[in-house]
A protein has these predicted regions:
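Beta-strand-enriched cores of mature, soluble protein domains
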Residues: 1-118
Length: 118
Protein backbone atom coordinates (compact mmCIF):
# COMPACT_ATOMS: atom_id res chain seq x y z
CA UNK A 1 0.00 0.00 0.00
CA UNK A 2 1.37 3.41 -0.92
CA UNK A 3 0.19 6.51 0.88
CA UNK A 4 0.01 9.68 -1.16
CA UNK A 5 -1.39 12.86 0.29
CA UNK A 6 -0.91 16.10 2.04
CA UNK A 7 -0.65 17.24 5.64
CA UNK A 8 -1.00 20.88 6.56
CA UNK A 9 2.18 20.99 8.62
CA UNK A 10 4.39 18.80 6.43
CA UNK A 11 4.94 21.06 3.43
CA UNK A 12 4.15 18.40 0.83
CA UNK A 13 2.04 18.77 -2.28
CA UNK A 14 -1.27 17.03 -2.89
CA UNK A 15 -0.50 13.80 -4.70
CA UNK A 16 3.08 13.59 -3.42
CA UNK A 17 4.01 10.17 -2.05
CA UNK A 18 4.55 10.40 1.72
CA UNK A 19 5.16 6.75 2.48
CA UNK A 20 4.50 3.11 1.82
CA UNK A 21 3.89 -0.09 3.71
CA UNK A 22 4.22 -3.77 2.87
CA UNK A 23 2.67 -6.75 4.55
CA UNK A 24 0.19 -9.57 4.30
CA UNK A 25 -3.42 -9.43 3.21
CA UNK A 26 -5.95 -12.11 4.07
CA UNK A 27 -9.36 -12.23 2.47
CA UNK A 28 -12.62 -13.96 3.23
CA UNK A 29 -15.94 -13.90 1.39
CA UNK A 30 -18.94 -12.24 3.00
CA UNK A 31 -22.60 -12.76 2.05
CA UNK A 32 -23.27 -11.59 -1.52
CA UNK A 33 -25.45 -8.53 -2.11
CA UNK A 34 -27.84 -8.75 -5.07
CA UNK A 35 -25.77 -11.61 -6.46
CA UNK A 36 -22.50 -9.62 -6.38
CA UNK A 37 -19.46 -10.66 -4.36
CA UNK A 38 -18.46 -8.96 -1.12
CA UNK A 39 -15.03 -9.59 0.40
CA UNK A 40 -13.39 -8.66 3.68
CA UNK A 41 -9.66 -7.93 3.55
CA UNK A 42 -7.41 -7.63 6.59
CA UNK A 43 -4.03 -6.00 6.00
CA UNK A 44 -1.16 -6.13 8.49
CA UNK A 45 2.24 -4.72 7.63
CA UNK A 46 4.92 -2.16 8.30
CA UNK A 47 6.70 0.65 6.55
CA UNK A 48 7.37 4.36 6.67
CA UNK A 49 4.76 7.13 6.65
CA UNK A 50 5.82 10.79 6.78
CA UNK A 51 9.31 9.64 7.81
CA UNK A 52 8.07 7.60 10.78
CA UNK A 53 8.40 3.82 11.03
CA UNK A 54 4.89 2.40 11.44
CA UNK A 55 2.95 -0.80 11.81
CA UNK A 56 -0.33 -0.74 9.90
CA UNK A 57 -3.51 -2.75 10.45
CA UNK A 58 -6.72 -2.24 8.49
CA UNK A 59 -9.94 -4.12 7.76
CA UNK A 60 -11.63 -3.38 4.43
CA UNK A 61 -14.97 -4.39 2.99
CA UNK A 62 -14.99 -4.51 -0.82
CA UNK A 63 -18.05 -4.98 -3.01
CA UNK A 64 -18.17 -5.99 -6.65
CA UNK A 65 -20.14 -3.65 -8.89
CA UNK A 66 -22.32 -4.71 -11.82
CA UNK A 67 -19.65 -3.54 -14.32
CA UNK A 68 -16.98 -5.78 -12.72
CA UNK A 69 -15.15 -3.01 -10.87
CA UNK A 70 -14.89 -2.97 -7.08
CA UNK A 71 -15.54 -0.40 -4.36
CA UNK A 72 -13.77 -0.80 -1.03
CA UNK A 73 -13.88 1.07 2.23
CA UNK A 74 -12.37 0.96 5.69
CA UNK A 75 -14.56 3.17 7.88
CA UNK A 76 -12.50 4.12 10.96
CA UNK A 77 -10.92 0.67 11.10
CA UNK A 78 -7.41 1.48 9.95
CA UNK A 79 -4.60 1.97 12.46
CA UNK A 80 -1.03 3.25 12.08
CA UNK A 81 1.16 2.66 15.14
CA UNK A 82 4.36 4.68 15.53
CA UNK A 83 6.80 4.87 18.44
CA UNK A 84 5.19 8.07 19.72
CA UNK A 85 1.50 7.27 19.19
CA UNK A 86 -1.17 6.05 16.81
CA UNK A 87 -3.27 7.34 13.94
CA UNK A 88 -6.70 6.07 12.94
CA UNK A 89 -7.70 6.02 9.32
CA UNK A 90 -10.71 5.95 7.04
CA UNK A 91 -10.17 4.77 3.48
CA UNK A 92 -12.30 4.50 0.35
CA UNK A 93 -11.19 3.33 -3.09
CA UNK A 94 -12.25 1.81 -6.38
CA UNK A 95 -10.39 -1.03 -8.01
CA UNK A 96 -10.24 -3.97 -10.34
CA UNK A 97 -8.80 -7.48 -10.44
CA UNK A 98 -5.28 -7.92 -11.84
CA UNK A 99 -4.05 -10.59 -14.27
CA UNK A 100 -2.15 -12.40 -11.50
CA UNK A 101 -5.27 -12.92 -9.37
CA UNK A 102 -4.82 -9.94 -7.06
CA UNK A 103 -6.47 -6.54 -6.96
CA UNK A 104 -5.40 -2.97 -7.47
CA UNK A 105 -7.21 -0.07 -5.79
CA UNK A 106 -6.85 3.71 -5.98
CA UNK A 107 -8.53 5.99 -3.51
CA UNK A 108 -8.17 8.28 -0.55
CA UNK A 109 -7.27 7.90 3.11
CA UNK A 110 -7.95 10.29 5.97
CA UNK A 111 -5.95 10.00 9.17
CA UNK A 112 -6.40 11.52 12.61
CA UNK A 113 -3.55 11.54 15.11
CA UNK A 114 -1.93 13.34 18.01
CA UNK A 115 1.41 11.56 17.44
CA UNK A 116 4.06 14.20 16.68
CA UNK A 117 5.76 11.99 14.07
CA UNK A 118 2.58 11.45 12.08
Amino acid sequence: MSVIGVSEGMGVMLGEKIGSTKGQTTMKPLPAVNGLLVMESVEIGSGTIAGAEVTVMATFSSSMRANGSWYGECPNSGVLMAADGVATGTYSATGAPTADGGFTFRGIAYFETVAPSL
